[in-house]
């Protein structure tokens, strides 16, 4: 069965979950995710939360294939671009509450962003059309490695030193993590 279909079915199954069905739930979850419980591919850590309490947690598969290190329920994962949807959702909630506008200039919230003579809006940042250089490209050129600890202060410093844009805001699309670091700050 397709893994994405399995996840969908799992979500569908969970909506009808009650506390008295915990053993049945455990068996159903194990059955659904056993495809990831191997030593030859990455896996996952899973927690099911109901009414603010963890009702199920388990790990499946391997965290580090090279060293055969298993995933545990407390394994930490790099969330990466999965966070972008939550960042934009948060910005849209703030807009709905009247606390900001997608047309606001990022410099209104983060004055460290240089004035490039062109307004960079929150919309530009959220849609990868800001023209800013990507933070990971800049970091790698500066000798940083992907597994180095990188703080928002590091990113803001990189952005503040940027001399020009790759293109005028809104004119082109270029995937840019920098925009989401800035949106997260807002």
Regions found by a protein language model. Name each.
Residues 183-186:
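Well-ordered alpha-helical scaffold segments within catalytic/enzyme domains
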